[in-house]
Swiss-Prot record:
One GO cellular component, as annotated: cytoplasm
Lineage: Bacteria, Pseudomonadati, Pseudomonadota, Alphaproteobacteria, Hyphomicrobiales
Pathway: Amino-acid degradation; L-phenylalanine degradation; acetoacetate and fumarate from L-phenylalanine: step 5/6
Family classification: Belongs to the GST superfamily. Zeta family.
Gene3D superfamilies: 1.20.1050.10, Glutaredoxin (3.40.30.10)
Alphabetized InterPro entries for the sequence: Glutathione-S-Trfase_C-like, Glutathione-S-Trfase_C_sf, Glutathione_S-Trfase, Glutathione_S-Trfase_N, GST_Zeta, GST_Zeta_C, GST_Zeta_N, Thioredoxin-like_sf
Kinase among keywords: no
EC number: 5.2.1.2
GST N-terminal domain segment(s): 3-84
The protein's name in its UniProt record: Maleylacetoacetate isomerase
Length: 213
């Protein structure tokens, strides 16, 4: 169908995970088309035709093709009423964006598949190098995020008392932190927020364990 909403994603991709949560929170029905990053399906001509960057996610929605997870989430916030993904007031939106960018632009890029593969290739023990790399950069990034949460606007969630784009960025990063055994003992605020999000159906349905083909 021409107007069908289709998400091209990879089950373990943080960026894809963010968009799955956003679509669920918006009540947007969609069909998932897996793009296997480990099999390099994102570099196949078919996927490069969808996204010249060769990245996931790609979202077909409203007759358009969208890329870049935060741009997609902002589009949903602007076109779907009542999502709350971005607050109404400019200063509140700025804070939500700052928190989101702290994950998506500072932690995520140095921990993505291509960067880590290069790290492993240059190490004697690739697996040990990968684990050390992930623990260092995810750990340092989330420690900074925890400090950002020490703010009057933090509520039950990253900003206020309902999930915003910031929570959609945080939760996949905490998932990755646990995957790589990052010590989160010094991050009680973000751990508590992640726990609250885990109780919400939209987050549960987006979890990698549910999205895995």
């Amino acid at each position: 169908m021409a107007n069908e909403t289709v998400l091209y994603d990879y089950w373990r991709s943080s960026a894809s995970y963010r968009v799955r949560i956003a679509l669920n929170l918006c009540g947007e029905a969609y069909r998932s088309v897996p793009v296997d990053l480990l099999a390099k399906a994102h570099r196949a001509p078919e996927h490069l035709a969808r996204n010249p960057q060769g990245l996931v996610p790609v979202l077909d929605i409203d007759g358009e093709r969208l890329t870049q997870s935060l741009a997609i989430i902002e589009y949903l916030a602007e076109t779907r009423d009542g999502t709350g993904l971005l607050p109404a007031h400019p200063i509140d939106r700025q804070r939500v964006r700052a928190l989101s960018y702290a994950v998506a632009m500072d932690i995520h890029p140095v921990c993505n598949l291509g960067v880590v593969a290069r790290v492993m290739a240059g190490a004697g023990d690739g697996e040990a190098a990968r684990r050390e790399w992930m623990q260092k950069f995810i750990g340092e990034g989330l420690a900074a995020f925890e400090r950002m949460l020490d703010h009057p606007a933090t509520g039950a969630f990253c900003h206020g008392d309902r999930p915003t784009m910031a929570d959609l960025c945080l939760v996949p990063q905490v998932y990755n932190a646990r995957r790589w055994d990052v010590d989160l003992a010094a991050c009680p605020l973000l751990v508590a927020i992640d726990r609250r999000c885990a109780g919400i159906d939209a987050f549960q349905r987006a979890h990698p364990d549910r999205a895995k083909p």
